């Protein structure tokens, strides 16, 4: 006779129930005379008891660690049982943590109605409870009244002891309490935060969830420290030039190969201006820095004039013979040196003359290394004394030069002149003529 699909499903379910009952039947006793309940993970509980165990209570509820587990034997495999959990006060003290230890700190608060936690597998056969340890891993401890079915309300800084109740249900005697079991190793003090650092370390060591949380926290702390160090490095590099003088020159040394060899420029750049470089380094780089004088100018190696862009630095400069332009064709010739700054208008002991006189000395002029586009009149003579500078005017001259008076060296602050003023003559544009560079 073949079984119908409905009969096959029913027999499959019944076989599953029979296998479930038989799983814990070997530990069962229909008479319940040898009922035995033992604490699971007893050595771990003993470690926490030696440090005075603490359990966190919060408004939303916090689970216990270590988790309360018991091993049960001696139940009727075919009877139905429920497992309940509640907490009772272990003493009549309120506790406080002083100098690294827990001491009684006064009278306890009035006791609240005891809350009972019912194991979610209840009710169930005795065989179900005996086949594996009964774990109360989902119970939560709270300091708020009426927290819910899975939460137990406890007073902070009070010592409690868990109690496990086994109730037989569904029998002819209806519901009756079979037994209650307590374990001294499971006593703890309810706290809102751990007080003992050794206890905290022990919980982190044995709690896999707390260890994972700690590892994540350590990774975040390590990453945060690494980001701070990375952010500080560019800050230190920017501030280094600000707080430490001389960390960067104002003018770095130029490339010695970027100038023509005929100019004879030294490669030291601005190294000799150490007083300017070490005065104060800017915290931010200047948008434009000139590392060397223009290629069209000669560089006087003996001159000591600072290369400053403002004209105010010219007022206090001493006048010496070795800093001025000299011409080999002039009567008063000294050692030829290059001028550090261009001279657009040549001032000499002679009067201003047309360009024909300048062309006569062109060969001497080109020996100085100055380009021809900056030569306007005669080549300058050595400045033994500053001559009188006169600007000629004519009747048709510009109002700027009309009725102009001669500017003596006395008015300009350079001393007295030994040369009498020359007659005023108008310099016309026809007197200017381009010069060609001689073959080198």
Curated annotation (Swiss-Prot):
Residue span of region Disordered: 282-303, 393-440
Gene Ontology molecular function: DNA-binding transcription factor activity; RNA polymerase II cis-regulatory region sequence-specific DNA binding
Keywords: Developmental protein, DNA-binding, Nucleus, Transcription, Transcription regulation
GO CC terms: nucleus
Chain intervals with Polar residues compositional bias: 409-440
One family name in Pfam for this protein: T-box
Feature: DNA-binding region: 44-215
UniProt xrefs under InterPro entries: p53-like_TF_DNA-bd_sf, T-box_DNA-bd, T-box_sf, TF_Brachyury, TF_T-box, TF_T-box_CS
Tissue-specific expression: Mesoderm and notochord.
Protein's GO biological process: positive regulation of DNA-templated transcription
Annotated localization: Nucleus
PANTHER family tied to this protein: T-BOX PROTEIN-RELATED, T-RELATED PROTEIN
Described function: Involved in the transcriptional regulation of genes required for mesoderm formation and differentiation.
Name of protein: T-box transcription factor T homolog 2
Originating species: Branchiostoma floridae (Florida lancelet)
Taxonomic path: Eukaryota, Metazoa, Chordata, Cephalochordata, Leptocardii
Gene transcribed to yield this protein: TBXT
């Amino acid at each position: 006779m073949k079984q119908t699909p409905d009969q096959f499903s029913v027999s499959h379910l019944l076989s599953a129930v029979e296998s479930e009952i038989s799983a814990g039947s070997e530990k069962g006793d229909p008479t319940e005379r040898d009922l035995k309940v033992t604490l699971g993970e007893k050595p771990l509980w003993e470690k926490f008891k030696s440090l005075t165990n603490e359990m966190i209570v919060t408004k939303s509820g916090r689970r216990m660690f270590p988790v309360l587990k018991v091993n049960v034997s001696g139940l009727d495999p075919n009877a139905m049982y429920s497992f309940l959990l509640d907490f009772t006060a272990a003493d009549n003290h309120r506790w406080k943590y002083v100098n690294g230890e827990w001491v009684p700190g006064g009278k306890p608060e009035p006791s609240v109605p005891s809350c009972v936690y019912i194991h979610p597998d209840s009710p169930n056969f005795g065989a179900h409870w005996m086949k594996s340890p009964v774990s109360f891993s989902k119970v939560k401890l709270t300091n708020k009244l009426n927290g819910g079915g899975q939460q137990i309300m406890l007073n902070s800084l009070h010592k409690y002891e868990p109690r496990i109740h086994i109730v037989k249900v569904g029998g002819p005697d209806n519901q009756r309490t079979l037994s209650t079991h307590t374990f001294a190793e499971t006593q703890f003090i309810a706290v809102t935060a751990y007080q003992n650092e050794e206890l905290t370390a022990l919980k982190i060591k044995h709690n896999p969830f707390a260890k994972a949380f700690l590892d994540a926290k350590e990774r975040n702390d390590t990453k945060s420290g690494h980001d701070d160090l990375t952010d500080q490095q560019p800050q230190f590099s920017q501030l280094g030039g600000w707080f430490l003088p001389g960390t960067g020159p104002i003018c770095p040394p130029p490339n010695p190969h970027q100038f023509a060899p005929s100019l004879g420029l030294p490669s030291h750049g601005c190294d000799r201006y150490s007083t300017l470089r070490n005065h104060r380094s800017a915290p931010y780089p200047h948008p434009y820095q000139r590392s060397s004088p223009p290629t069209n100018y000669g560089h006087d190696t003996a001159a000591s004039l600072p290369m400053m862009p403002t004209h105010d630095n010219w007022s206090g400069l001493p006048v010496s013979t070795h800093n001025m332009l000299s011409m080999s064709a002039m009567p008063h010739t000294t050692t030829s040196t290059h001028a550090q700054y261009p001279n657009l208008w040549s001032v000499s002991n002679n009067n201003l003359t047309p360009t024909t006189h300048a062309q006569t000395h062109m060969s001497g002029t080109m020996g100085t290394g100055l380009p021809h586009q900056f030569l306007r009149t005669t080549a300058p003579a050595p400045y033994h004394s500053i001559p009188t500078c006169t600007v000629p005017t004519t009747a048709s001259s510009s109002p700027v030069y009309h009725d102009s008076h001669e500017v003596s060296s006395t008015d300009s602050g350079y001393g007295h002149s030994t040369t009498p003023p020359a007659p005023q003559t108008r310099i016309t544009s026809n007197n200017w003529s381009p010069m060609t560079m001689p073959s080198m």
